[in-house]
């Protein structure tokens, strides 16, 4: 019986793919070597310890229907589209060794005609006339008895969109959490015009088989049929939840200020696990009562635009004469935290 397992996803859903990865990792025998190949439609994937409001332009992502996905490994934020190929190598300990999986990817690139080399802890780079350019980034996760190495290869990604989503709004965030480091990148199509996802997957697969001296049939993983993986439904529900993707952000503070025709407003939020743990409001408005009431209502509220709007608009019952001001305030707060 082969010790290898090859899985290929035909889904572009990042939550589905990361849930598949998590389930395979948890239930694989320690003697198995796994290769999982996949790709995501428009998504920003953040590291386990990152703050999405600090790393991403969450407002632009919402406008452009770009998903946010938090992975279980560390590292920084990356933008995925269908011009990326994603790979995951898994193995039990003591065999797990990220230098092996790195060499498999380098061998695959070499077979395609690309000479790349490892750089730093996580990257693969190629030489260009403008200097070294990153074509692959990786992250890692280890438990007591197993580990995985996952990463991306830039094939034909729309690099102009990286700045759209990975440069956050200049919000006044005093945030804990790991900040991403931006690197100079290039696509493999600059070196291999016309290279496809399928060709890259084939090259990685062949290099994987060659390294271990075994071959195995690929298993196609599809959302059309619930994968036969233990606890998949629960894992997918968690992976796709706001509580995981946003709510797991490290503790941070957010300062908002705005000048309206009826007065200036300054809001201070402390946020932990996606909930507002403290809200302070300062204003020179001639009628501060609605804002003072709002500060009380926001304590414990989810740090989410629709929930904040809901709390603002609930004040209309007690302060109907301030409807215009409260609606302006509601729209401003919702826009500021998206």
Curated annotation (Swiss-Prot):
Gene Ontology terms, MF aspect: ATP binding; lipoate-protein ligase activity; lipoyltransferase activity
Binding site for ATP: 71, 76-79, 134
Entry keyword set: ATP-binding, Cytoplasm, Ligase, Nucleotide-binding
InterPro entries: aa-tRNA-synth_II/BPL/LPL, BPL_LPL_catalytic, Lipoate_ligase_A, Lipoate_protein_ligase_C, LipoylTrfase_LipoateP_Ligase
CDD domains: BPL_LplA_LipB
Protein location: Cytoplasm
Catalysed transformations (reactions): L-lysyl-[lipoyl-carrier protein] + (R)-lipoate + ATP = N(6)-[(R)-lipoyl]-L-lysyl-[lipoyl-carrier protein] + AMP + diphosphate + H(+)
Every BPL/LPL catalytic domain range: 29-216
Pfam families, A to Z: Lip_prot_lig_C (PF10437), LplA-B_cat (PF21948)
Positions contributing to (R)-lipoate binding: 134
Gene Ontology cellular component terms for the protein in this record: cytosol
EC number from the UniProt entry: 6.3.1.20
PANTHER family assigned: LIPOATE-PROTEIN LIGASE (PTHR12561), LIPOYLTRANSFERASE 1, MITOCHONDRIAL (PTHR12561:SF3)
Family the UniProt entry places it in: Belongs to the LplA family.
Remaining remarks: In the transfer reaction, the free carboxyl group of lipoic acid is attached via an amide linkage to the epsilon-amino group of a specific lysine residue of lipoyl domains of lipoate-dependent enzymes.
Oligomeric and partner information: Monomer.
Name the UniProt record assigns to this protein: Lipoate-protein ligase A
Provenance organism: Escherichia coli O81 (strain ED1a)
Lineage of origin: Bacteria, Pseudomonadati, Pseudomonadota, Gammaproteobacteria, Enterobacterales
